[in-house]
């Protein structure tokens, strides 16, 4: 999926938004929290 090509950028706000990035070491998409 195209969203898996995005880097894991955490952000600087108080939001809590689940996002995904492609972890090249693990070889799969992984979830992180943006906010």
Curated annotation (Swiss-Prot):
InterPro entries tied to this protein: Kunitz_BPTI (IPR002223), Kunitz_BPTI_sf (IPR036880)
Record domain BPTI/Kunitz inhibitor: where: 4-35
Entry GO CC: extracellular region; nematocyst
Compartment list: Secreted; Nematocyst
One MF annotation (Gene Ontology) recorded for this entry: serine-type endopeptidase inhibitor activity
Keywords: Disulfide bond, Ion channel impairing toxin, Nematocyst, Potassium channel impairing toxin, Protease inhibitor, Secreted, Serine protease inhibitor, Toxin
Top-rank taxon, per record: Eukaryota
Residue runs in coiled coils: none
Function: Dual-function toxin that inhibits both the serine protease trypsin and voltage-gated potassium channels (Kv).
Homology family: Belongs to the venom Kunitz-type family. Sea anemone type 2 potassium channel toxin subfamily.
Name of protein: Kunitz-type proteinase inhibitor AEPI-III
Organism (species): Actinia equina (Beadlet anemone)
Lineage, uppermost ranks: Eukaryota, Metazoa, Cnidaria, Anthozoa, Hexacorallia
């Amino acid at each position: 999926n195209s969203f898996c090509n995005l880097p894991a950028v955490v952000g600087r706000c108080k939001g809590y938004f689940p996002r995904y990035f492609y972890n090249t070491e693990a070889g799969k998409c992984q979830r992180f929290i943006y906010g």
